[in-house]
Amino acid sequence: MASDCSPTGCSSESSARASDCALASTCSVETTCLPSACATSSCQTPSFPSGARLPTGCLPPACFAGSCNIPCVVGNCAWCEDGVFNSNEKETMQFLNDRLASYLEKVRGLEELNAELECRIREQCEEDVPLVCPDYQCYFDTIEDLQQKILCTKAENCRLAVQLDNCKLAADDFRSKYESELSLRQLVETDISGLRGILGELTVCRSDLEAHVESLKDDLLCLKKSHEEEVNVLRGQLGDRLSVELDTAPTTDLNRVLDEMRCQYETVLANNRRDVEEWFAAQTEELNQQQLSSAEQLQGCQTEILELKRTANTLEIELQAQQSLTESLECTVAETEAQYSSELAQIQCLIDNVENQLAEIRCDLERQNQEYRVLLDTKARLECEINTYQGLLDSEDSRLPCNPCSATSMSNDTCEPCSAYVICTVENSCP
């Protein structure tokens, strides 16, 4: 499409078409202030064939990233005729300059803030001493030793409990034996007391018999004396007056008979005495032997009972000592557990503090990353605006040496850079 760039060639029809195109192609740019979102433009760029020249009255508007609802109309024939910017281009340049200055100030402030934050982080990292976990291996070894001692003490307590049970059973057996022996002793003592009663009765009987024998001896002596007296009296009365010889049986000798009776009684008495003494001696010997054996058994039982009592006392003392040792070990274990629990709580508090610091550092890093992304987006928008600004400056530099469209020098080649700039501006501004 060829267009006439002369002043007289710009007819009212082309002016109306240019104004309508400018109004129809007014660029409304919407920017979203998101960190990762790039500025989007609602500018609809008309498509033109490559190498085609646009009419001067209907140039597409230049869309600038970051400008909100700012009409940027580029392509009025006034700049070709007058060689200066119109009011819209001046306002756009002023707006871009203000935006560039504000962005530069923001970038400078953010760089200073970033440097300050880096210095603070570096100082904080230098000040923070790395947390070194203390070595608790010695405490763990002590705990293991105490646990081994507790296990050994428990085993020893079990062994002592078994021995104590065995001693109790043995003591019960000896107690039953002692009771049986005591009952036997009581029976033997009862028999001895009965035999002693019989012995007393026999002694009384013996004394009675001895008294009876003595009385019989006295009677015999009295009889002998009375017989001798009677014989003497008779012999004295008879004298020598009468001598009578009788052929009769010989008279018995009373003395001899009495002697024989005395001998028989004495023999029987001696035999009875000997038998009684032998029986008494045998019974006494047997009772003495039983008493000695019972005394020996009783002494042995008493000795065993004393030994068992001594052993039971010793075991009870050892049990009390082991119980006290176990209680002390349990107290020590409880104190150790409490101490380790407090230390673990302190360590957990330190870990929580470090985790909170790490979380704060992560939040700071995330915030800085977000700010960095925002800065990158801002930088991209600034670069886009700078490119647009540079394009406008280049276009201004390219337009300044050109004369307004004269009737003699205006041709198709003269407007070629303008149309190329407009196409380049549209391609760079509205991708």
Curated annotation (Swiss-Prot):
Identification of the protein by name: Keratin, type I cytoskeletal 40
Keywords on record: Coiled coil, Intermediate filament, Keratin
UniProt superkingdom: Eukaryota
InterPro entries found in the cross-reference section: IF_rod_dom, Keratin_I
Positions of region (Coil 1A): 90-124
Misc: There are two types of cytoskeletal and microfibrillar keratin, I (acidic) and II (neutral to basic) (40-55 and 56-70 kDa, respectively).
Region listing for Coil 2, in residue ranges: 253-396
Region ranges (Tail): 397-431
GO biological process: epithelial cell differentiation; intermediate filament organization
PROSITE patterns registered for this protein in UniProt: IF_ROD_2
TM regions (residue ranges): none
Molecular functions (GO terms): structural molecule activity
